[in-house]
């Protein structure tokens, strides 16, 4: 959801996943007042639900000249693009006054069955409730033998977090990032 979106899409109120796979969906919203928004999750599988605020990051080069005619880009202009998932801490986020979204993730360990996930967003001025009928079919896909490789720059973690390279703090960060990567199916890393 781009900050300057003009959303006219229909709400999807149900989704289906297979047992053993993560599921996720977005909730788009706009609060004209720059205020705190309280996020509350209810339902019989809420212990398997994580909510993230989708943060925007600056993009200076959205596409190369060779791809100018490719229709599959959200936008080809520099700007702020939704990319970073920030865990919702203490059930609150800050409204920006433009369109924002929440990323609602359901862990693959959630039990099979038909579940209702309710996410309530409330601010000083209004309250909205988003309900999702979330069906988990009791069938699992076989383990994949696909090798999913991504670059991993441990030196960048040390620079970003301002910790000494190869220090205990750096190794702790490396461990956390690799654990997160494996949670998203990455099973091989390339290091420079």
Predicted features along the sequence, with ranges:
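Surface-exposed binding patches on compact interaction domains or structured appendages
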Residues: 1-10, 22, 32-104, 111
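An acidic-aromatic substrate-binding cleft motif
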Residues: 129-192
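Sequence-level detector for tyrosine residue identity
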Residues: 25, 48, 52, 73, ...
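Residue-identity detector for threonine
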Residues: 9, 16, 35, 63, ...
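N-terminal basic, low-complexity leaders that serve as flexible interaction/assembly modules and, when applicable
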Residues: 3-5, 16-17, 58-63, 67, ...
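Extended acidic/polar, glycine-enriched regions
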Residues: 28-38, 90-146, 171
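Solvent-exposed, low-complexity, repeat-rich "mucin-like" stalks and linkers
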Residues: 12-37, 167-172, 176-179, 184
